Structures are given as C-alpha cells and as structure tokens.
C-alpha cells in the first residue's frame, strides 16, 4: 500500500486514538532531551527522509528536545570511489588516512549535514548544522584500537579516527533553549587542531550521557538486534551482549553501535533503543506510542 493510500485509509476515530495514545508520552517526555543517531536507509530513501524530518519537527513542537547526530557512510563511499579510493573498515571503524579524512569532512560536514538541516527546515523546524569543530565542542584524540583476542597493548593504527576526550554541552543547550534543533556531524578536533573522524554511534552515545538525555535512539537497517536465526531480540543485557559478541552474532558496524548503546545505558541515559530506520515514522512509533520498533538495551 502506498503512503498516500495508507493515510487515506486511516479513519477519524483511529486518528483520535493515535493522538490519545501519544498524550501520556508527550507529558512524560516534555522538555526532555532525546538524542537520535540518524543513518542507514532512512538517510537515502526520499520518503523515509521526509518521514524522519517531520518526526523530528513534531517532537520539537510538542515540547521534546531532539538532538540529531548523523552518519553518511554511503555518501562517503560514493565520493571515495570518484577519487579512486576504496573504503576499509576494522571492527566497524573506517580506516581514515589524510586523504580519506578530507573526503569524510567534506561529505559529513558539508553535503550530508546541510541536506538534513534543509529537510528539517522545510518540514517547519529550525535546524542548525554543526561539527565538533564548532566552538571546539567535541574534543578528541587519536584512537588506539585494541586488537580483538590479542594481548593488551596490541593495537591497530586506523589513521585519523578519533576517541572523544570531552564534550562541552553548552552550545547544544543554548540551541535547545532557543527552539533550534542541533544536527551534528561526527567530526572532532584535537588539542593541536587535528581533525578526527569519529564513529557517529559513539558520538551519539557520549552526547546522550553528557546531556543527561532521557532517550538514545539509534536508527539502523535491520529490525533491531537479531540473533543468528534472524529473530528480533527485543531486550538485551550486558551479559547477553557479551555472549553475542563472543559467538560472532554481533560484528562489523554493529559493534560500535552496541558498545555505544551499552555505555550510555550504564552512564545514566534512561532508555536506549536500536530501531528499524526503514519503518515509516519509526521515531514517533518508538517515542510516542505503546509499540516499540526495535531492541532496548538494558544496563543490567
């Protein structure tokens, strides 16, 4: 069924029921911060992009404070291919030499960030695009990545990939108070002005901790976290996550996502969700209805 015919089939009574269901959640989350990691198909499908922008604007209009952190992997790969480079990943992190860093900053801080800002503004919001270099609000240092199943100190050089050292929340708080919607590209700055590519899931998780967010919502291209049989796991504890990593169920790009989600849950973020970004209006379904659309990460 098309989006148009689906909308036309919703009766006035059902619309009223949907609004009534949302009311207690609007009251509960009023003036609360919701950090959203935006990525995957939701960033490439035109209809899903429109749904995402309208969801974010609606959340702001009913009194929540959405903060968007975005990725841009497919767009980075496209530009790398144009300059004759191929992306390389280690444990879900993009290996970033100097030339790749230029491409990453151009794509994330320019093309992708401004497209998201424009989408939200066209939907009626007031979005402001940022990177961690703005006001130096995301400070970082070179990430020394520990090899899996190797002795401590056995590290992999992944180039200009950054590890967050500090986040100054004052800029984001200032924008929230002014009814703006921050849209953040995951680029950090070093003490000597170095530029660092930081995994967007990691930035979203750390930002949620610093802002004392009510929720962290990570969009992905799957229904959530799946077991080896492809079944959705609606809730995960740290012990279960360790088991899934050990048996290889969780790997690649899901590793930083899960790690970020678990750290946030352990450090004060009240609820953390990995949801299906391919579902229309997935944010509203997760935040303002009784029916979640993914996996909830528990701190214990």
Curated annotation (Swiss-Prot):
It catalyses: N-acetyl-L-glutamate + ATP = N-acetyl-L-glutamyl 5-phosphate + ADP. The keyword Transcription does not apply. InterPro entries: AceGlu_kinase-like_sf, AcgluKinase_fam, ArgB, Asp/Glu/Uridylate_kinase, Glu/AcGlu_kinase, NAGK-C. One of its GO terms (biological process) is arginine biosynthetic process via ornithine. One of its GO terms (cellular component) is cytoplasm. CDD domains: AAK_NAGK-C. Its EC number is 2.7.2.8. GO terms for molecular function: acetylglutamate kinase activity; ATP binding. The record marks 37, 257 as: Transition state stabilizer. Pathway: Amino-acid biosynthesis; L-arginine biosynthesis; N(2)-acetyl-L-ornithine from L-glutamate: step 2/4. It is found in: Cytoplasm. Substrate binds at residues 72-73, 94, 197. It is an enzyme of class 2 (transferase). Its main location: cytoplasm. Keywords: Amino-acid biosynthesis, Arginine biosynthesis, ATP-binding, Cytoplasm, Kinase, Nucleotide-binding, Transferase. PANTHER family: N-ACETYLGLUTAMATE SYNTHASE, N-ACETYLGLUTAMATE SYNTHASE, MITOCHONDRIAL. Catalyzes the ATP-dependent phosphorylation of N-acetyl-L-glutamate. Belongs to the acetylglutamate kinase family. ArgB subfamily. This is Acetylglutamate kinase. It comes from Azoarcus sp. (strain BH72). The lineage of its organism: Bacteria, Pseudomonadati, Pseudomonadota, Betaproteobacteria, Rhodocyclales. The gene is argB.
């Amino acid at each position: 069924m098309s989006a148009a015919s689906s909308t036309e089939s919703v009766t006035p009574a059902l619309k009223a029921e949907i609004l009534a269901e949302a009311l207690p959640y609007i009251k509960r989350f009023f003036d609360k911060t919701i950090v959203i990691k935006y990525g995957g198909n939701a960033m490439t499908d035109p209809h899903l992009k429109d749904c995402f922008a309208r969801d974010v604007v609606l959340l702001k209009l009913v009194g929540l404070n959405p903060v968007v952190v975005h990725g841009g992997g497919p767009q980075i790969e496209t530009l790398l291919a144009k300059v004759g480079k191929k992306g390389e990943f280690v444990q879900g992190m993009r290996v970033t030499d100097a030339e790749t860093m230029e491409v990453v900053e151009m794509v994330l801080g320019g093309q992708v960030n401004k497209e998201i800002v424009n989408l939200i503004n066209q939907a009626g919001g007031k979005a402001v695009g940022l990177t961690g270099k703005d006001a130096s609000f995301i400070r970082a240092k070179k990430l020394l990545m520990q090899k899996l199943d190797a002795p401590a100190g056995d590290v992999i050089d992944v180039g200009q990939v950054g590890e967050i050292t500090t986040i100054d929340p004052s800029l984001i708080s200032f924008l929230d108070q002014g009814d703006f919607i921050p849209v953040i590209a995951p680029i950090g700055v070093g003490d000597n002005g170095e530029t660092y590519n930081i995994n967007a899931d990691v930035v979203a998780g750390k930002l949620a901790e610093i802002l004392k967010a009510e929720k962290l919502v990570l969009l992905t291209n799957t229904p959530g976290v799946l077991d080896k049989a492809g079944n959705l796991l609606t809730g995960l504890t740290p012990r279960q996550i360790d088991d899934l990593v050990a048996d290889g169920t969780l790997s690649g790009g899901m590793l930083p996502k899960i790690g970020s989600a678990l750290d946030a849950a352990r450090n004060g973020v009240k609820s953390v969700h990995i949801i299906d970004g391919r579902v229309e209006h997935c944010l509203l379904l997760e935040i303002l209805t009784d029916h979640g659309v993914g996996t909830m990460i528990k701190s214990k």
